[in-house]
Amino acid sequence: MDERLVRQIVISNPQWSGRPPAEHMDVIVPRDSIAELLSYADDRQIVIVTGPRRSGKTTGIMSTIQQLLDRGVDPKRTLYFSFDEVLSREHTVLEDVVSYFIQNVVPEGATKKAPAFLFLDEIQFIKDWPTILKRIYETRANVKVFASGSSSLGVRKGMGESLAGRAFDITIPTLSFREYLAFKGIEVPKIPPVWSDTKVPESFMLVQNEVTNALTSYLVRGGYPETVDMRPISKVHRYIQQSVLDRVVYHDLLETESIANPASMMHLLKILASMSSQRFEIANIAPDIGMKAQTASKYLSILERAMLFSTCYNYTKSQVKQARSSKRAYLADTGLISALLGLDETTGSQELGRLAETAAYNHLSRTSPAFFWRDPQGNEVDIVLPSKRAPIPIELKYQTSIYKSDAKGLVRFCDVHGCDKAFLVTKDKEGAMNIGDIEIIILPLWRLLLQT
């Protein structure tokens, strides 16, 4: 076996010699999505870790290794290896790494009572990796595999049928507002969903000023962990442009997709950023970038699978109507919008409103399908969440003054769908108003973003 590969394996696993699996493990901030990884440690299935670029996937893996060690797992039963710097991309490299670990490191081999844990990063660089993981799954019952890659599109595309039924796909998104606050050292108590309880714990009052002061910064910077304390904002823009946007469009996607003009795709992203939270028609966008509608539609699909963009559909019982009706565009993180459009904390109210609605949609769509609603008369509701009892309509008005007319779309939606309660999200107002038999709950954006 190549001595350089052995040396790289050993260097990548400082926990074997009694050190932490990575530097600064003591300052890693707990995250819900990362905690979820550990909950799959005892399951037979492979765990495929996906998520946007720079969202914290590798940190999540390191944190999971540390938590296993804290649980009493022998460090020599854990392996971390990243394939981004290996000279060969052949499947034999992956096989050699696993064989060396099992045969030379794991004490007394992997058993049911003492399994071994593989954490394989940048797995997309290895040819035919799904087949190798399938073979490990089928022949090494006591070896648990976690695999991830910075190119989530490449990883998801590679999974194919080989790992069907053999793998869980866990997404680590960019930071939620709650996680962003935790990164800044602001601990917020658990707050229930506003549709079940409008009250917040009394202890929240101790941090409310810090929370409201941090909100604009979160909207403008977005949720990329490495930008939380980055200054000035122009550096944040440069980081997102170079480390996320350029890397995905000009590198990751070219390895997995047929893209004739990546510069046009970046132009399309910029147009989508200017329209985030608004309705769009692909036939109207395509001519602006000198592209056929069919090509633009293909690029949109690729951007969505690359976790840079998402399509929001009109809330209707008919999936045929849903597919044919107009849609709304949302970029996957508000930091992408700011980087593409050059927004900062002095951004005007219209742009902040777009960021606010994008943040609300992205937050809610993490845990539930999310739609918008528009009727033939032009009445609209920004976000609709399906619910067993009745759908939950939510309107965003990121402003300080609220009028009954702001709830017009909510009232119409409730009349059509038999709801008796709706939600109006504002910049800083809270309370309630009744319009006929409909109760409109008014709440500030931070309240929505912090609910658990």
How would you label these PLM feature ranges?
Residues 130-146:
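Conserved catalytic/switch belt of AAA+ P-loop NTPases
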Residues 4, 8-9, 158-265, 269, ...:
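Interdomain motor-coupling "hinge/lid" segment immediately C-terminal to the ATP-binding subdomain
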Residues 81-113:
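Short glycine-rich substrate-engagement loop in P-loop NTPases that contacts/grips substrate
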Residues 144-150, 171:
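Structural recognition of the conserved hydrophobic beta-strand(s) that form the central parallel beta-sheet
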